[in-house]
Amino acid sequence: MRAEPWQKAEVPGPLKASVITKPEVVVAMVRRARRPLLIVGPEASQAGLGDRRLIDYAVLIAKAGKMGVVATAQTVGEFLKKGFQGAVWMPAMDIANRLCDPGWKGLDGAGRYDLVLVGGIHYYVEWVILSALKHFAPSLKTVSLDRFYQPHATWSFPNLKVEEWLKQLDLVVSGLEKTGG
């Protein structure tokens, strides 16, 4: 488990993501959040092992955490295939820009988000989005759910093998289901 950026050419600066060594950290953050949001990208339908995909975990996390969901690219169709109706479609860069806007009141008009979980977005795109949020929305906490370390997130898993990553996601889901989000 290494906390080194997967993308070597970029330098994240002096402030790097804290490493998620215990999935309970993610569960506690979601529980404490007033307005959590989950952003899911197109790799969610491919990332995983066997019949377990990130999209399946995204549905479970969204339901258990009682959070809004933004699906980027064609991902909204994947949510519909899973029977999840609560996903809103928006381009990845658009949701990033809106989250940086202090005047934006959220997808439902109920106010700003205080926690954003991100997964399934191409590594280099997620890198740029998280960098923008780190610098232009500093009060927003971010969590990368992907298996490669994202230094611009507030919290990120280290570089993990697929099997270990899925175990961590299983623990996040079971923790959220136990605590009721």
Which residues does each predicted region cover?
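Cofactor-pocket helix-loop regions in the catalytic cores of large enzyme subunits
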Residues: M1-A71
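Short, ordered loop/turn segments at secondary-structure junctions
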Residues: P42-A44, A73-V76, R147-Y149
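Glycine-rich, anion-gripping cofactor-binding loops and their flanking helix/strand elements
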Residues: L49-K66, V70-H135, T154-F157
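Glycine-rich, acidic loop regions that bind phosphate or pyrophosphate groups
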Residues: R2-A9, P14, I121-G181
